[in-house]
Amino acid sequence: HEAGHYFAARRYGMRVIRFSIGFGPTIWKHKPKDSPTVYQVALIPFLAYVQIAGMNPYEESDPNDSGSYANASLWARIVTIAAGPLTNYFFASVLIFFGLLIGGKEVADETSMKVFVEAGPAQVAGVQTGDRVLAVNGQDVHTWEELRRSVSAHPGEAIDLAVDRDGQTMHETVTPGPRGDKDEGLIHVRMPTHVQAVGMREAATMSVIAPPIFVYENVKAIGRVLSGKEKLQVNGPVGIVKETARQAKTGPGVLLQFLGMLSAYLGAFNLLPFPALDGGRLLFLGAEAISRRKPDAKIEARIHAVGLLMLVTLIACVTYADVFAK
């Protein structure tokens, strides 16, 4: 993400003062000869930043300084800010491409009535992953569509689920939960999957379409949370590290795909029109393009400072929940 900002700024002749991985006390830094940029690694690794000359309105600046962000053209500033999220999407596609080539893709096995049990009513009732569904309320089911229809018809009503477990027929009483705001039942089981090899062309296609689809699904999920249809579930830095470690155990291909989706999400998050985020800065640049007049740089800086404080507070609260509330 920050590399995108860095290379775009350099492309338009802006002077990059600092490229930092992490923030807080510096533990390593290097300034190449004849370079204006200090490259550093800081103690707290959860954030990174690029310091570009002229972005801080409280610093002394020369109106004739061609290396200053403040003196760059509107287009150069828009590209420099947008380059971060766009790099996230590009990096996401690269990671997903190689992840698919290495690890393949998961394909649902619709011919098997064996279930993979997720957290929900079926798990609570005692249904186990690997059970093969035989019948619902005495009615035989032979396809996943028949199972879906049988369960959907009984939201909030106890049903008798007959399953084959290691050659023995078991009967579990399951009460389907609601499917969002629909009057349909859901017991949270899904088809078993198997890994299928992916060729170069398919991997390339999927690597392009997967990031926007992932972001779209997350936007829909946020909408369901805001409408009260689902509970908010947020992972902070600690939770993300834990999930990354969990994905790593499944293999390098799956890990690369997960990191690709994470990169896409980071890019989308940074495009939100919120102060301190790239989307917030693009909002000010858009206003400048429409009004043909620069906003007061110091007022804009104060707004971004408030936004940054709010984001840091949010990250701290989510991190606390990751560590102590889970």
Regions found by a protein language model. Name each.
Residues 128, 134-135, 149-192:
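PDZ-domain C-terminal substructure recognizer with occasional recognition of PDZ-binding tails
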Residues 11, 44-112, 255, 304-313:
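Internal alpha-helical transmembrane segments
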Residues 64-75, 176-268, 280-306, 319-326:
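Functional transmembrane alpha-helices
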Residues 10-14, 100-108, 228-232, 323-326:
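Transmembrane helix-loop junctions in multipass membrane proteins, especially transporters and channels
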Residues 1, 41, 84, 147, ...:
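Residue-level signature of catalytic and energy-coupling elements of molecular machines
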Residues 94-102, 267, 271, 315-322:
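Hydrophobic membrane-targeting alpha-helices
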Residues 122-144, 303:
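Conserved PDZ fold ligand-binding element
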Residues 2-63, 262, 272-291:
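Small-residue-rich helix-interface/hinge motifs
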